[in-house]
Amino acid sequence: VLLAQNAAGGGVTALFTPNESTTFGMLLALQKSNLAGKLKFVGFDASDKLLGAVEAGQIDALVLQNPFNMGYLAVTAMVDHLRGKSVPPRTDTGAQLVDAKNLSDPKIQELVKPDLAKWLGP
């Protein structure tokens, strides 16, 4: 109700949600309030439903992480640390902004639907 009132009066023009569950919850609230696609909406992480909402124009963009890269860099840093090498205090594992224009890009598709057999074997 508060969202609908603020959006109707021009008080809310854009939204950002910081994880998959809040992004999905906000999408449901916007759909229920008939505001989906009427406000700028950027979320974080992805699911099939959220990607469908990007494709449908109900979410403007999603920020995606690269779980494989996160794990790989973490293990590499730990191995380096155990071998006595210097390890940076922070490591940027990367993020990718996904919108309707680049959703079908092969690099984006690899993030949202990784070929697990490639890494885990048959």
For each predicted feature, which ranges?
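A residue-level marker of the well-folded mature domains of exported/periplasmic proteins
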Residues: V1-P122
